[in-house]
Amino acid sequence: RKEYDATLPMIFMNSFRTHEDTRAALAPYGDLAVAGLDLGFVQNQEPKLKADDLTPISWPADSGLEWCPPGHGDLYTALTTSGMLDRLLSLGYRYASVSNSDNLGAAPNAAIAGWFATTGAPYAAEICRRTAADRKGGHLAIRKSDRRLILRDTAQTPKEEMDYFTDEF
């Protein structure tokens, strides 16, 4: 914000389990909030399923344990249904830089923002070479049905292809 004299909001998508903890952790940093925007929104939740038959689990002692967050792939749906997307657009924001919380080196980049503004590109992904520490998260793959490049997560990777998912090259 200081370097570019720009009002860049920092917004967290949390699960129903982490939202209040995140708010409490950010409370001491009063200068993080941008006028008209919350510091976060809550992603959706979905039922936990049994691995053997994919039916919902039942936890009568605590029905809250029957639910789980769908993960970072829920970003687009949660942005829309939470009203956050409408608020951002109404305040004049046109671009978003999205980073997962485990990407601690992520930061807004003026050159990338300029590239979007100049080209009109609807989307771009920042990718890097995997290291020995990169054993989870997504990886790039070529979809067999149409030969398109996709980002594939663990749940989408067949057991016989997990070697590719966890390789370093």
Regions flagged by a language model, labelled:
Residues 1-169:
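Domain-scale recognition of functional cores that engage charged ligands
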